[in-house]
């Protein structure tokens, strides 16, 4: 298992988790080609990153390059509808305690889907997840988003008309 993150502090938090000894951690800017071998992974997970990537075509080609032909790519991203509410990703840096609002890029759902297709990935499943009463019960701050889609999930598999060709 390999985990990649831009933030050294986030990687340090991950290294402290149970089972971390079995994980290879790589600090890397996801806007650049990954320093990993082609077709090295059965499953490629991309979690809450896409809204920080300006060039989706290049990024999805990289996800496709890393995935074995029989594997899958699973993507989670803040739902594009959240940008209509003025919501941008933000977090507290565990190393400094400072509030961080990384640069974001407003993409539409079709931007994500078409970049994946152009990269040679086929959509196998897509789901949208809205704030509900259970979420509000866990976090009262979510009440203002009740009923709004907050998360977009996609399962993609290699194949399709994309222009991907392994190097």
Regions found by a protein language model. Give the residues of each.
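Conserved class I S-adenosyl-L-methionine
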Residues: 72-103
């Amino acid at each position: 298992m390999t985990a990649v993150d831009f933030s050294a502090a986030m990687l340090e938090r991950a290294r402290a988790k149970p089972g971390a000894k079995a994980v290879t951690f790589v600090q890397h800017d996801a806007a650049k080609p990954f320093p990993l071998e082609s077709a090295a992974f059965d499953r490629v997970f991309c979690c809450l990153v896409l809204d920080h990537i300006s060039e989706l075509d290049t990024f999805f080609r990289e996800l496709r390059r890393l995935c074995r032909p029989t594997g899958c790519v699973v993507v989670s991203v803040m739902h594009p509808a959240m940008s209509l509410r003025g919501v941008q990703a933000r977090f507290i840096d565990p190393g400094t305690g400072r509030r961080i609002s990384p640069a974001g890029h407003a993409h539409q759902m079709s931007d994500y889907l078409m970049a994946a297709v152009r990269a040679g990935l086929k959509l196998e499943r897509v789901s949208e997840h809205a704030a509900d009463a259970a979420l509000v019960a866990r976090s009262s701050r979510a009440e203002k988003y009740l009923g709004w889609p907050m998360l977009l999930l996609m399962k993609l598999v290699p194949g399709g008309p994309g222009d991907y060709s392994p190097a």
